[in-house]
């Protein structure tokens, strides 16, 4: 495509260059790079409400959703000087200068460099010490379909309501569901992870045939896994309203709870979501106005510790944590020699 086929978008007081706008990004949908830009412009107010002010990790797809990708925490060289950034860290202490989703112009810039959606930190760049989101990732294991994930989400809602905590569901844009809890910014990510470990364990106790808190895949069986480690410090999660790198342009879409029982996630795409929002509004529109307390879940975590339960295993890239059991799959631990 010739260079003069590029387009310029005026958004949030900026002129953002979009190169190769007619490149097909989602073949099954017949949707282009500029269709993706247009989608984000259409739902911009809602996207600002969930992503605004958060650091973001870039995942770049130069050839669209079906092509190869690479992750990039650092803003690339040659980026415009108006981009806002903040310093983020990895579990081993390495720092990067990451993009901050300061406004919609930053999202359009990210699309232009090949991002389809963004992976967001659970805190605002202005307050990196305090997570203001708890993220419950309901992950289907092998042999599990969306009906089981749906059932697990409703079980999770019931437990949260019992604890006086308001949760907000969304599709992942793929096979699972997320439930977000907007928190008062009073706790760090270590506390949030501990809270979700306790939640996962209690859900497994109540629904052992449906839900598992087992970190090791060999122990999960055909159950829905509550991935508590998505709340570990420095972890990012794919943000609400962003399109996934799937050929059909599926979107990670916030839902009302009554929609969980009937939603068909693959039908929620960059073509259908704007009209859906116009018709029934933004289910997460007032979430930030009602921040929740983590204390009921932390009390549950304390009760587990008092009962002798150790911490749950951490991902391999994290240093060994106090109270963590041996970081080895149970089958391997059983095979280890007893002698020195």
Language-model segments: residues:
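Catalytic palm subdomain of template-directed nucleic-acid polymerases
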Residues: 180-193
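C-terminal accessory nucleic-acid interaction domains of nucleic acid-metabolism proteins
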Residues: 1-30, 37, 48, 52, ...
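SsDNA-processing nucleotidyl-transfer enzymes
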Residues: 2-12, 41-142, 146, 150, ...
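Short beta-strand
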Residues: 59-61, 167-173, 214-218
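Long, well-ordered alpha-helical scaffolding segments within enzyme catalytic domains
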Residues: 39, 146-165, 192-208
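Nucleic-acid 5′ end/cap handling module spanning
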Residues: 147, 170, 183-185
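Catalytic micro-motifs at enzyme active sites that drive phosphoryl/nucleotidyl and oxygen chemistry
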Residues: 121-125, 165-171
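Short, conserved phosphate-binding/catalytic loop or strand-edge motifs used
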Residues: 171-181
């Amino acid at each position: 495509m010739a260079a003069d086929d590029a387009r310029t978008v005026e958004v949030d007081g900026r002129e953002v260059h979009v190169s190769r706008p007619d490149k097909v990004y989602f073949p099954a949908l017949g949707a282009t790079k500029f269709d993706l830009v247009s989608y984000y412009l259409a739902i911009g107010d809602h996207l600002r409400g969930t992503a605004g002010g958060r650091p973001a990790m870039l995942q770049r797809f130069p050839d669209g959703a079906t092509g190869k990708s690479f992750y990039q925490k650092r803003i690339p060289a040659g980026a415009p000087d108006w981009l806002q950034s903040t310093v983020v860290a990895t579990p081993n202490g390495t720092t990067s200068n990451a993009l901050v989703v300061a406004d919609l112009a930053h999202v359009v810039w990210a699309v232009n460099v090949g991002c389809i959606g963004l992976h967001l930190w659970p805190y605002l760049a202005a307050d990196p010490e305090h997570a203001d989101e708890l993220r419950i990732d309901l992950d289907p294991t092998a042999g599990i379909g969306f009906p089981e994930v749906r059932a697990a989400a409703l079980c999770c809602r019931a437990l949260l309501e019992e604890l006086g905590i308001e949760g907000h569901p969304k599709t992942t844009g793929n096979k699972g569901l997320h439930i977000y809890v907007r928190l008062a910014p009073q706790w760090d990510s270590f506390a949030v992870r501990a809270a979700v470990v306790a939640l996962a364990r209690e859900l497994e106790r109540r629904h052992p045939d449906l839900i598992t808190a087992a970190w090791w895949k060999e122990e999960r069986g055909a159950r829905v896994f509550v991935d508590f480690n998505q709340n570990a410090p420095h972890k990012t999660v794919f943000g609400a309203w962003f399109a996934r790198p799937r050929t059909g342009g599926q979107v990670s879409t916030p839902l009302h709870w009554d929609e969980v029982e009937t939603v068909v996630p693959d039908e929620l795409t960059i073509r259908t979501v704007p009209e859906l929002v116009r018709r029934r509004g933004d289910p997460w529109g007032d979430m930030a106005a009602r921040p929740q307390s983590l204390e009921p879940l932390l009390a549950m975590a304390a009760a587990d510790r008092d009962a002798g339960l150790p911490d749950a295993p951490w991902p391999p890239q994290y240093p060994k944590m106090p109270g963590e059991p041996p970081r080895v799959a149970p089958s391997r631990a059983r095979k280890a020699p007893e002698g020195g």
